[in-house]
């Protein structure tokens, strides 16, 4: 078995996933590019999409293979991991990037669309981590990078399904970072902002120019490497900038027994001093977009 580290990237055929795969290869990893080639809404498929990125890596002198299995199923996630183990005999890092969009207001959203988005973003990440876990433990320097979003951290109108899945990944990071610590695993998440097919309809053109996926991937390459010492972090990243996101609590206050007293306490707690509060992901991204818009 080679000493070369092996990284598996889901959603690796386009946008951020492709950029991550190229960055991991540039760092020296063998890369398993996993992507069904589906459309933005998760329908259809093109097995050649993943192979095109793997071929691009090989043409540049790297080592890569492709898999077009659907990691939003137990069997597909296991098959993707098995592909890595069969070809390389090891798996050291998982970058869970696969995702789809089916945006609608919650009142109008079919539950099938809710389920589909949660399955691809949250369940697929968990399925892949579960399938890869024994190999990541065996590595001794196993690394997992999940892909969260400001939409989950702060909320975004019309994205109840997407936001629920992305915040679910934060919970998964919190637990897996604890459970993997003794085995040397490091589990982190990024909340990226980049010009991709998901964001191009949503962000102003001036900002998109400063939000290349390649400005996110160096962070992912580090988090997936043996050099990464941190675990349990959620890092918002884009436009060449990065910030840590944390859940904070106010001071504890006495909870009265009467309705009026409870209402007053809740109103008081709604305005917590310290930190930078955001009412939505749009507000949270505003400072980053302002920087990106000024980039040449």
Language model feature labels by segment:
Residues 189, 207-294:
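C-terminal helical subdomain
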Residues 149:
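Residue(s) in the substrate-gating loop at a strand-loop-helix junction
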Residues 57, 105-106, 113-115:
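Substrate-binding pocket helix/loop in short-chain dehydrogenase/reductase
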Residues 2-33:
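Canonical Rossmann dinucleotide-binding motif of NAD(H)/NADP(H)-dependent dehydrogenases/reductases
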Residues 47, 51, 68-79, 111:
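The beta1-alpha1 cofactor-binding region of Rossmann-like NAD(H)/NADP(H)-dependent oxidoreductases
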Residues 3, 60-63, 83-96, 102, ...:
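A glycine-rich helix->loop->beta "capping" turn
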Residues 129, 165:
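Active-site helix of classical SDR
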